[in-house]
Amino acid sequence: MVLEKLKHVPDPTFVHQEPLAEFIANLFTAAGMRPNEARLCADVLVDADMNGIDTHGVCYNLDLHYLTGLMNGYINPTPNVKVTYETPGTAVIDADRGMAMIASVKAMELAIEKAKTTGIASVAVNNSSHYGAAGYYARLALKHDMIGYTMSSGGGRVIIPMNARYPWMGTNPMAFAA
């Protein structure tokens, strides 16, 4: 019976990138986000889909993580993203429970600026939401002829190592761009 249903899967519907990003940004704005930050988050989600990372794009994450989080109050729609610690080559950013995309882009932009002076830089983000597709942030460095490396310790302890009884590792996504 299940296989019979699979024989009649409808053809996919294709949507152009720009109208989709605009629609998603409007949804985020309606959920209380600032328009410029809503558009940034929409662009990150659409970019994931455009790069074949469906698990971190619009269809999988829009409702599951982001809109649900905004509507239920566990994602702050108007965060005060700020640097809480800084040295010439490092920094820590507090995302104020906001969308991780906002703080992650800010972190990479700050790392790029610091690396122009110091040669290498590292910026950490805390107090944020679902990280999204790591490759988006890493690729920001390419525009400045730099190598980008991003990672997250997100997801909590969900991986059970071999011969263990309980989960004690995260999925810890990472991306390189060179």
Give, region by region, the residue ranges found by the protein language model.
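Aromatic/hydrophobic pocket-lining residues that form π-stacking "cages" and hydrophobic walls in ligand
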Residues: 24, 111, 137
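N-terminal and secondary-structure boundary signal
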Residues: 29-32, 49-54
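Short, well-structured alpha-helical segments
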Residues: 35-46
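Active-site cofactor/substrate anionic-group-binding motifs, chiefly glycine-
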Residues: 56-112
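Conserved catalytic cysteine-centered active-site region
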Residues: 110-123
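Glycine-rich anion/phosphate-binding loop at the beta-strand->alpha-helix junction
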Residues: 120-178
